[in-house]
């Protein structure tokens, strides 16, 4: 079954320093029919104002994938680790119990725009805490998978995530790993 949902139908937030669109129930936005999709719990588009930060917080055991669309971000954890990611990069953070994480827009002049996905992590799998790759700008790129194949980020879940960039009138086709549950955004 194919369900179509426009950006205007998504949950929205505007806190001044943060503007967001929520595909699934998140924060103050709640729709009992939209609690996630299989292991995908969060799919947000967020714009952080220049210099804005998310304060440190803990997460459930999830893999957080950030696709940086514009700007540059810094991610820190309570263990002293930090990493930066800029436009055109994908950053995967494998959250751990008891560790807090914070996020910052490094620019004092430009906004930071990103897509953020949270995927439930399999409890018995452990991966590197932070992984990063370049989004190549190819028509189609595998960006995350359970085994890190084709230079992709390695997830703690049986999920394959592709980045597909099409110009008006272009088409693409590729073989799906799991025909039972596929999502296109």
Can you say where each PLM-predicted feature lies in the sequence?
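A contiguous pocket-lining binding segment that forms or flanks enzyme active sites
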Residues: 113-148, 152
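Ligand-binding loop in jelly-roll beta-barrel domains
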Residues: 95-125
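Conserved short histidine dyad/triad with adjacent acidic residue
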Residues: 4-14, 21-31, 41-59, 69-76, ...
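Conserved small/polar residues in nucleotide/adenosyl-binding loops
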Residues: 182-185
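A short secondary-structure junction signal
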Residues: 102-104, 125-133, 152-156, 173-176
């Amino acid at each position: 079954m194919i369900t179509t949902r426009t950006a205007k139908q998504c949950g929205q937030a505007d806190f001044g320093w943060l503007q967001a669109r929520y595909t699934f129930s998140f924060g103050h936005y709640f729709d009992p029919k939209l609690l996630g999709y299989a292991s995908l719990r969060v799919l947000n588009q967020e714009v952080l104002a220049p210099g804005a930060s998310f304060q440190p917080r803990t997460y459930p055991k999830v893999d957080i994938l950030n696709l940086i669309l514009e700007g540059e971000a810094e991610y820190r954890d309570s263990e002293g680790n930090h990493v930066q990611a800029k436009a055109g990069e994908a950053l995967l953070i494998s959250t751990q119990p008891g560790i807090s994480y914070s996020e910052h827009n490094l620019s004092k002049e430009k906004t930071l725009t990103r897509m953020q996905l949270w995927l439930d992590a399999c409890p018995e799998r452990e991966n590197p805490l932070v992984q990063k790759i370049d989004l190549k700008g190819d028509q189609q790129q595998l960006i995350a998978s359970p085994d890190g194949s084709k230079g992709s980020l390695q997830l703690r879940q049986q999920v394959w995530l592709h980045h597909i960039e099409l110009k008006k009138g272009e088409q693409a086709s590729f073989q799906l790993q799991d025909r039972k549950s596929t999502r296109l955004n």
